[in-house]
Amino acid sequence: MKRYLLKDYIDILKKENLVEDVCLCDSILNTSIEKLEHNSKEVANNTLYICKGLNYKPEYLNEAIVRGATAYISEPENVTDPDFPHIVVNDIRKALAAVSCMYYDFPADKINMIGLTGTKGKSTTAYYIKSILDDYMKEHNLPDTAIVSSIDTYDGKECKESLITSPESIDLQEHIANAVDCKMQNLVMEVSSQALKLDRVHDVLYKVGVFLNISEDHISTIEHPNFEDYFASKLKFFAQVENACVNLDSDYIDRILENAQKSKKIITFSTKNEKADVFAYDIKKLTHTSISFRVKTSKFDEEILLTMPGLFNVENALAAIATAMVLDIPFKNIYNGLKVARASGRME
């Protein structure tokens, strides 16, 4: 993996207007940064240490220095050792995201990033998309699809149960880099409101971004103090999306579509509005475990079979179909992928 110099990290922070002050000697600017860390216990020689978190304590920086840190990045209030080389920033979370992208050599630029946000259905839709893409990739003898979800994470090197929906920016960039190293072409991920609010996905550009729905949820002193904060966090997503797939059946659709204009292209889907780009009709419950419907697009008008019942899963499937169309996946792979798709035993 390419290694960047300390001066490169300073440059990218300056480019994003995050730097307030640089307090270090020119002699260390050409130091190769071998590690990026926000956990002081993991610091080694030539580490760029990030002072972040509500629970940050000065002793963490002291430990990082003892363990061999080259310099640290901090907001003004956490500059607890002014004599040690440091970079002062105005937003530590955006700074962490920016330097994480650089440390892993901007992996999101080398893979199709597919992000999903919404109150409900993210996990199911993520697995629908993965199943469709995996069917296509298998047919062409290509690596399968990486996924970062609230259920589990698979990046070609690691396969593990997920602890949170969207990981911290440095961990996310590692997963993306692993997928790139494994020659994967696509990565599907859930993008939570917290990830957007706390800038964990800052500087990640999505080839496809799906906005499933919005309703009052996650309102608490821990996550979002009110619905407006929650909704505004979700809407930040569109600024990072090239092709936006939007559910016309969602509440607050006018505001969603207004913000979706930030994307280069909007693809709509619906079970109610025939004018949608991807429209489901003739929905039939076949058994207690299966449902069928016809889907009409500009390219095809065909029947789809799902082995996960419920109208909400028809909406999730439409989102997956819209995504597949953006990526030019043929209908046969869409059909095959949805027919066998399961969300790791969980039905949303």
State each model region's role:
Residues 77-78, 91-94, 213-217, 270-274:
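Short, acidic/turn-prone active-site loops that include or flank metal/cofactor-
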Residues 81-91, 160-163, 207, 262-268, ...:
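Active-site regions of enzymes building and remodeling cell-envelope glycoconjugates
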Residues 96-244, 248, 252-265, 318, ...:
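Phosphate-binding loop of NTP-binding sites
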